[in-house]
Amino acid sequence: MFNVRQLIATTLLLSCAFAAQAERLKDIASISGVRSNQLIGYGLVVGLNGTGDQTTQTPFTLQTFNNMLSQFGIKVPAGSGNVQLKNVAAVSVHADLPPFAKPGQVVDITVSSIGNSKSLRGGSLLMTPLKGIDGNVYAIAQGNLVVGGFDAEGRDGSKITVNVPSAGRIPGGASVERAVPSGFNQGNTLTLNLNRPDFTTAKRIVDKVNDLLGPGVAQAVDGGSVRVSAPMDPSQRVDYLSILENLEIDPGQAVAKVIINSRTGTIVIGQNVKVSPAAVTHGSLTVTITEDPIVSQPGAFSNGQTAVVPRSRVNAEQEAKPMFKFGPGTTLDEIVRAVNQVGAAPGDLMAILEALKQAGALQADLIVI
């Protein structure tokens, strides 16, 4: 059905005419079903230098430790529930299992304390099974932790903490034991899911694929998905997708947006943001309250007491700001230049943008995060 060599030759010829702003298909879309899977496990970190869990306050750590010893045939005497294990910490372990991971491959893992351990620095994770959402074990984790933070405390109670010492990573710390079933080789079609749904982008993908492979090979399901015909043979399917994912697509322009982070004062204005004709003036009201208490001294032989009498001064100043006008189709550069001319701070710019949106003059989505 598909001649891979002819596809490669045709793709190389077409790539010469692509615009500089075009993006590869693999950068704007993903293949349905080809995804990573989250794994999680519970285990013990040992070898800590006295920074482990206080097991009297975290009984689950001691219980886990006793269960581990019982697996090695070691019986813990009854009544030892108050044993303090300073070098052991209960941890959660999580990892992302990449698509097509096979048994024997390794993945990175993240280890985080779930008790009251002060630091995992210098610790080693004991064998920990990692399970998926279905309850099956897909990987086994074990190894020495790499911890970027540290914690130090003096005898007088002074303390310093750098970064987060209660979490660390083990590069290649988990060995894959089971592959995740994949539907990649099933059926005669594949679905491409756009990272940012857009009807224009979906149509351009369909046009590009059909121009290369023939009419009807690609069909748009909706603004976020495109279905393409694919070879049934697995090896041909891989070659086929290697060609498709390197096609250069000119994506549609993003929706005009203005993003405001009210906590940090960050404002991001998209390139396509425009403003309808409007006039803006923004003044700043400054209220100053100063305290200048005076001392009231009683007269001699009056049997009075010296008292402090509060005296407050309140002053309000309204800073005049010039008015500036936005003409029809004002662009991002003109907005920034006009606002900078009046010396508006990020907080003032937020108020101006919100007012423009309420007035219907801001031709963009205003999103506050």
UniProtKB/Swiss-Prot annotation:
InterPro entries: Flag_FlgI. Residues 1-22 form the signal peptide. Its main location: periplasm. GO terms for cellular component: bacterial-type flagellum basal body, distal rod, P ring; outer membrane-bounded periplasmic space. GO terms for biological process: bacterial-type flagellum-dependent cell motility. Keywords: Bacterial flagellum, Periplasm, Signal. It is found in: Periplasm; Bacterial flagellum basal body. GO terms for molecular function: structural molecule activity. Assembles around the rod to form the L-ring and probably protects the motor/basal body from shearing forces during rotation. The basal body constitutes a major portion of the flagellar organelle and consists of four rings (L,P,S, and M) mounted on a central rod. Belongs to the FlgI family. This is Flagellar P-ring protein. The lineage of its organism: Bacteria, Pseudomonadati, Pseudomonadota, Gammaproteobacteria, Pseudomonadales.
